[in-house]
């Protein structure tokens, strides 16, 4: 297996131009495909998850031109639903941001009725989709499970989504609601969506609603408990759509600055629509010095203290707090993060396991993790298992800010969202 060893870093300094956001890139491509008119999507992320969406759209008859560096994509909108060739099968890797929204969009009524299969990597077949399928079926969709009940692969007939009253469980993933919201304007009737339980990751719903607005569709949001969407609408291309820098990817660089130097990230700022920008507020609460601009966030070292916090609203960036916690004074508790367990891997168990390898004292609960700080000279050199999970690889690069090297196994797994992560990270590292 490939691996990369990061030597101890004495300080960090510099500016990082962030790649486009994964969440925004895949939403933008799908909305542009369904919209009337041509959309030029700029600062698109070039990564595995985006490639899976682009390949799927091409197979569904969407025409687009991708620039040589793959960061600009001109999409010719269909002005409505997909034309599906019968017996088409789409392989979506482990891309939840492609699987979930496409599951809903492919249920919409096509010009001719046909069946399509959605499948992916073995891990995708372990990632639940029951709550989305249940909701779509209430709205009249025709979906079958091909292997295990509640999980991909799926067979979908494009008979249409009728709309009406739909209840959806919000407790596992906000992507289910995002998928339903994005397809609802193209349903035959108005849709009223009622959330069962507590809606997780609300800021991701804010992203969805803001982007739908950019493509000409308004949704009535009643305190995240009920959403009303008019049916029989069309998305209208805004002509150009700029994808913000990825706020989750920003977290590793900002944390490095907070631990041992000064780092600025550009492509995201105080007016960002991404919830993970709030990661900088968590660093500030821990003691770091944070500066916000229109198009940048900067983190500077100050003494860090542990924190006890509900991080349900920033589940991806919260992982970075788990490794940052080792460099603080006092214990850190990250709470209400059950949905770490249904991501690319079971992230709660994975983080606890790998943190212990570097010498940390950790307690893992059903939906929380307790982490004790570690003196710089007590870190152990470990081989970090990454579980084919890009975020684990990136989080554990911060361990090199101790006096000890860290070895990351399968570093190429960052290709899911940030193929050039390790070369970018090296740019800010200073060594004695």
Swiss-Prot record:
Keywords: Amino-acid biosynthesis, Aromatic amino acid biosynthesis, Cytoplasm, Transferase. The active site is at 316 (proton acceptor). The keyword Mitochondrion does not apply. Pathway: Metabolic intermediate biosynthesis; chorismate biosynthesis; chorismate from D-erythrose 4-phosphate and phosphoenolpyruvate: step 6/7. GO terms for cellular component: cytoplasm. It is an enzyme of class 2 (transferase). 3-phosphoshikimate binds at residues 22-23, 27, 173-175, 201, 316, 339, 343. GO terms for molecular function: 3-phosphoshikimate 1-carboxyvinyltransferase activity. It is found in: Cytoplasm. InterPro entries: Enolpyruvate_Tfrase_dom, Enolpyruvate_Tfrase_sf, EPSP_synthase, EPSP_synthase_CS, RNA3'P_cycl/enolpyr_Trfase_a/b. One of its GO terms (biological process) is chorismate biosynthetic process. It catalyses: 3-phosphoshikimate + phosphoenolpyruvate = 5-O-(1-carboxyvinyl)-3-phosphoshikimate + phosphate. Pfam families: EPSP_synthase. Phosphoenolpyruvate binds at residues 22, 96, 127, 175, 347, 391, 416. Its EC number is 2.5.1.19. The keyword Transferase applies. Belongs to the EPSP synthase family. HAMAP family: EPSP_synth (MF_00210). Catalyzes the transfer of the enolpyruvyl moiety of phosphoenolpyruvate (PEP) to the 5-hydroxyl of shikimate-3-phosphate (S3P) to produce enolpyruvyl shikimate-3-phosphate and inorganic phosphate. Monomer. This is 3-phosphoshikimate 1-carboxyvinyltransferase. It comes from Haemophilus influenzae (strain PittEE). The gene is aroA.
């Amino acid at each position: 297996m490939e691996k990369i060893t990061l030597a101890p870093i004495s300080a960090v300094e510099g500016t990082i131009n962030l790649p486009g956001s994964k969440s925004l890139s895949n939403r933008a491509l799908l909305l542009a495909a369904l919209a009337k008119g041509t959309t030029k999507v700029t600062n698109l992320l070039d990564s595995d998850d985006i490639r899976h969406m682009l390949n799927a759209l091409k197979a569904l008859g969407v025409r687009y031109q991708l620039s040589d560096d793959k960061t600009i994509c001109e999409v010719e909108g269909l002005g409505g639903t997909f034309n599906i060739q019968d017996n088409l099968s789409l392989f979506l890797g482990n891309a939840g941001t492609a699987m979930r929204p496409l599951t809903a969009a492919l249920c919409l009524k096509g010009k001719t009725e046909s069946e399509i299969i959605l499948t992916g990597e073995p891990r995708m077949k372990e990632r639940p989709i029951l709550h989305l399928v249940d909701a779509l079926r209430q709205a009249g969709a025709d979906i079958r499970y091909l292997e295990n009940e509640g999980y991909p692969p799926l067979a979908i007939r494009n008979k249409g989504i009728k709309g009406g009253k739909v209840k959806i469980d919000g407790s596992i993933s906000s992507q289910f609601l995002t998928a339903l919201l994005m397809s609802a304007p193209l349903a035959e009737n108005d849709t009223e969506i009622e959330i069962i339980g507590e809606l997780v990751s609300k800021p991701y719903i804010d992203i969805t609603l803001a982007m739908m607005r950019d493509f000409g569709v308004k949704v009535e949001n009643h305190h995240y408990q009920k959403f009303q969407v008019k049916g029989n609408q069309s998305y209208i291309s805004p002509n150009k759509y700029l994808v913000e820098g990825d706020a989750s990817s920003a977290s590793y660089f900002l944390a490095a600055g907070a631990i041992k130097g000064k780092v600025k990230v550009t492509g995201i700022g105080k007016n960002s629509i991404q919830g993970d920008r709030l990661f900088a507020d968590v660093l500030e609460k821990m003691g770091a010095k944070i500066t916000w601009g229109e198009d940048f966030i900067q983190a500077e070292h100050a003494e860090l203290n542990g924190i006890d916090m509900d991080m349900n609203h920033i589940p991806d960036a919260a992982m970075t707090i788990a490794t940052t916690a080792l460099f603080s004074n006092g214990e850190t508790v990250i709470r209400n993060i059950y949905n770490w367990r249904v991501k690319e891997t079971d992230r709660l168990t994975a983080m606890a396991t790998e943190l212990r390898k570097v010498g940390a004292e950790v307690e893992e609960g059903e939906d929380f993790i307790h982490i004790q700080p570690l003196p710089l000279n007590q870190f152990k050199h470990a081989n970090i298992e990454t579980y084919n999970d890009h975020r684990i690889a990136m989080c554990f690069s911060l361990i090199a800010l101790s006096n000890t090297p860290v070895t990351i196994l399968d570093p190429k797994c960052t290709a899911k969202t940030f193929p050039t992560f390790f070369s970018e990270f090296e740019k800010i590292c200073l060594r004695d």
